[in-house]
Amino acid sequence: MKSIFFKSLLVIVFFNIQCSKSDSKTSNLITIQQLEVKKQEIVSYISRFNCSATVGCNSIAFGSKACGGPKEYLVFPNTVDLDFLRNKVNQYNALEAQYNIQTNAVSDCMLVMPPENIGCVNNVCTILD
């Protein structure tokens, strides 16, 4: 009788541990919606700043392709808080890299180069052809 009780108890404990592990995995999953919200926050932050003839523009690698490297480059005026922007972009890039692993994402693996020609058009930093 004790043996059956002990085995039953072990089975219950085992399943409880397995359930809590899968619950924690589910809560750590990154969604495409979360990435879109974070990207919009970054783009919105950048859009609050203007460039001019005296305020130049720069670019930062953004996103994470499944096979490595950035998906694109964001352009921004030099008046942004660069440390803040880098921090937000690095967080986003890390989340997207984690999302790629989590979803077994694939990409074209094409190397995206930083823009060579960035200019200020109507007070907005723009990649020029």
Go through each PLM region and give its residues.
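Mature extracytoplasmic domains of secretory-pathway proteins
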Residues: S59-A94
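Bacterial Sec-dependent N-terminal signal peptides
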Residues: I17-E36
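Post-signal-peptide N-terminal segment of Sec-exported extracytoplasmic proteins
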Residues: V37-E72
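Short flanking/linker segments adjacent to small metal-binding domains or redox-active Cys/His motifs
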Residues: Y99-D129
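Sec-dependent bacterial lipoprotein signal peptides
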Residues: M1-I17
